[in-house]
A protein has these predicted regions:
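Transmembrane helices and adjacent periplasmic/lumenal helix-loop junctions
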Residues: 143-147, 205
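Hydrophobic alpha-helical transmembrane segments
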Residues: 47, 84, 149, 169-173, ...
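Hydrophobic alpha-helical transmembrane segments that constitute the membrane-spanning cores
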Residues: 89-97
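Alpha-helical transmembrane segments in multi-pass integral membrane proteins
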Residues: 1-17, 23-42, 56-74, 96-102, ...
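Hydrophobic alpha-helical transmembrane segments of polytopic
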Residues: 17-24, 45, 51, 87-90, ...
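Individual transmembrane alpha-helix segments
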Residues: 130-143
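Alpha-helical transmembrane segments of multi-pass membrane proteins
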Residues: 73, 77-90
Length: 370
């Protein structure tokens, strides 16, 4: 029988996660809109990666603790129902806007296939064209989908052969170190283009695995560790936030050296940030992130992430208005499209996912990756 150190908790909505999604998609939108401040959109993607690793691993841990098994069939079916329909709607949107002439970049069958079958990241690494304009963001979804495909198998193996959570975390940490070494080798020894390490699953998967480590050994939902007093943890989270945002705005991360270690540092900084925001939802930061309008944007964030760039580029190509007006119109179009998809597609499918779930995740919590 598998070793279980902690009973599975009853989980519903984890505080602050939807708000963190909203903040992340706002960073990405601001960057792609080329608004003042020079914020780097990749910072938001890093948060998405960590959040996905944390939440998906939490769900798997709860299911395994309750049932002493993980239904891979149900896991993959839930992921398909969550990820595929909005993504294919976004691809259709890009193709329609291209056919109408509002998006002008050429589209190829290969680019559409790369988008649809989750290898857009390596398509971009190969400097191939043909992905519908604005849907280059699907590179990050490809990284996450590779994680969804492989990590459940690894997690089941760890629960069987490494029953203690500390050993599981150590094993994943060793993988993260290997990724860091590989990334550094590519950049500093082979001199590859930083684009190679930015987009590659093999060079970015550690960002997701750090979230998984957090879920396994430091999970606030389980009360795995006795956290410092709220004031101490808040100060640590505040300092980590300042350091994390320095990556978002500073050009220091544009160097090869920073590309090699920067993703690791950012992922580590997110640990105290997530720990505080999950355990202190009544703090001022927690109240902002859990404010209903902000949390609702987090619920819509997956679709908003998918379609914000096509709308931005379409508005810019067609209207010729002042930049800030175009950005505002694109933001409204993005929000309305995402809201419509949520009502017509995501909510009905969330109900279906809940019916096939062994772990009994809440509808909101199951909205895992973005």
């Amino acid at each position: 029988m598998p070793h279980r150190e902690t009973p599975a908790p009853r989980i519903g909505l984890i505080p602050s996660l939807d708000g963190l999604r909203a903040a992340s998609v706002a960073i990405v939108f601001w960057a792609h809109a080329e608004m003042p401040g020079g914020v780097r959109g990749g910072t938001g993607v890093t948060v998405f990666f960590f959040l996905s690793g944390y939440l998906i691993t939490t769900l798997m841990r709860v299911e395994y603790d309750r049932h002493e098994r993980l239904s891979l069939r149900d896991f993959y079916l839930r992921r398909v129902l969550r990820i595929f329909p909005p993504m294919y709607l976004a691809i259709c949107l890009g193709l329609i806007l291209t056919a109408l002439g509002t998006l002008t970049a050429p589209v190829s069958a290969g680019g559409v296939a790369a988008s649809a079958f989750f290898y857009a990241n390596y398509w971009k690494i190969a400097e191939l064209e043909g992905i519908p304009e604005g849907l280059g963001v699907l590179w990050s979804l490809a990284v996450e989908e590779h994680y969804y495909l492989l990590f459940p198998l690894l997690y089941v193996a760890m629960r069987r052969f490494l029953p203690r959570r500390g050993h599981q975390a150590l094993f994943l940490a060793l993988i993260c170190v290997a990724v860091l070494v590989w990334r550094s080798w590519l950049l500093l020894h082979d001199g590859v283009n930083p684009v190679r390490v930015y987009y590659g699953t093999d060079t970015r998967i550690d960002g997701i695995l750090l979230g998984a480590i957090f879920a396994i050994v430091l999970n606030p939902v389980y009360g795995d560790v006795r956290l410092p007093r709220r004031g101490v943890l808040g100060a640590l989270a505040g300092a980590s936030t300042l350091a994390f945002m320095a990556f978002a705005f500073s050009r220091i991360v544009a160097t090869d050296e920073a590309y090699s270690w920067g993703y690791t540092v950012q992922g580590l900084l997110l640990i105290p940030i997530f720990a505080y925001l999950i355990t202190a939802p009544t703090s001022w930061a927690g109240r902002v992130l859990n404010w209903k309008p902000v949390a609702f944007l987090g619920v819509l964030s997956y679709v908003m992430y998918l379609v914000h760039a096509p709308f931005l580029y379409a508005v810019q190509h067609v209207l010729g208005l002042p930049h800030v007006v175009e950005v505002a119109l694109a933001a409204v179009a993005t929000f309305l499209f995402a809201w419509g998809v949520n009502l017509a597609v995501e909510r009905p499918l969330a109900t279906l996912r809940k019916k096939i779930s062994h772990a009994g995740e809440s509808t909101t919590m199951m909205a895992a990756s973005r």
